[in-house]
Design a protein with these regions (language model features):
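Non-catalytic terminal extensions that flank enzyme cores
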Residues: 1-53, 67, 71-81, 97-103, ...
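Short catalytic/ligand-binding loop motif for oxyanion handling, primarily in non-cytosolic enzymes
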Residues: 49-51, 86-90, 152-155
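Di-metal (Zn2+ and/or Mg2+/Mn2+) metal-binding site signature of metallo-dependent hydrolases
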Residues: 53-60
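Short, solvent-exposed turn/loop segments enriched in Gly/Ser/Thr/Pro and often Arg
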Residues: 80-87, 147-148
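A glycine-rich helix N-cap at a beta->alpha junction
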Residues: 101-120, 134, 138
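Active-site cores that bind ATP or allylic diphosphates and position pyrophosphate for catalysis
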Residues: 136, 140-183
Length: 185
């Protein structure tokens, strides 16, 4: 661990990003630890294919910011690696067996598709396990979260209902930010 005063003066991008988080939460002098007791950082993973260098890079970069943050200010942090495993399969990856079988599941949630490798409950579960194994080999400090589990547990229900109830207000905010070519409502 480096000295806090030194960490606050470093110009490397992870430290600049960490300082932005601190600034948005009261600054160095008035920083308040969030009510949950930690600052949360998150990475996302779309398990429609096997983990790759881009997946690794996202976790590395976020971990660098997390470590810089912890060097600058005394506040617990948590890194969540969130798997969007309810996403639909858009195309069959080139580097998997049983491609013909997977073709039948285009558009289906990744955790509802049989594992073409025949090792896990689903293709999504297989790729999630690969990611966790990959991250564990490099000793990343993270918590893995599956969107399938979150949906099945009802963890998103309140937010989804809130979105439905405020749909028009949300559109009023979002639509002006979209290019006209993207609007198909």
């Amino acid at each position: 661990m480096i000295d806090q005063e030194l960490a606050q003066s470093l110009k490397a991008w992870p430290f600049k990003e960490a300082l932005q988080i601190i600034k948005k939460n009261g600054g160095l002098q008035n920083f308040k630890i969030p009510s949950k007791g930690y600052v949360l950082l998150e990475t996302g993973y779309g398990p429609s294919g096997l983990p790759h260098i881009g997946t690794f890079g996202e976790v590395v970069r976020t971990s660098m910011v997390k470590n810089a943050f912890s060097s600058i200010i005394d506040c617990p942090t948590k890194l969540i690696t969130f798997s969007d495993d309810m996403d639909g399969l858009r195309k069959v990856p080139e580097n998997v067996p049983n491609k013909e079988m997977l073709e039948k599941f285009i558009g289906k949630p990744l955790t509802s598709i049989p594992d073409p490798f025949g090792k896990f409950e689903s293709f999504g579960h297989h790729n999630n396990a690969k990611l966790r194994s990959f991250l564990d080999k490099f000793n990343f400090d993270y918590e893995f979260v599956s969107s399938t589990e979150k949906y099945q547990n009802g963890d998103f229900n309140e937010t989804i209902l809130n979105i439905f109830e405020n749909y028009s207000k949300i559109l009023d905010i979002i639509l002006p930010t979209l290019r006209l070519s993207l609007i198909h409502i």
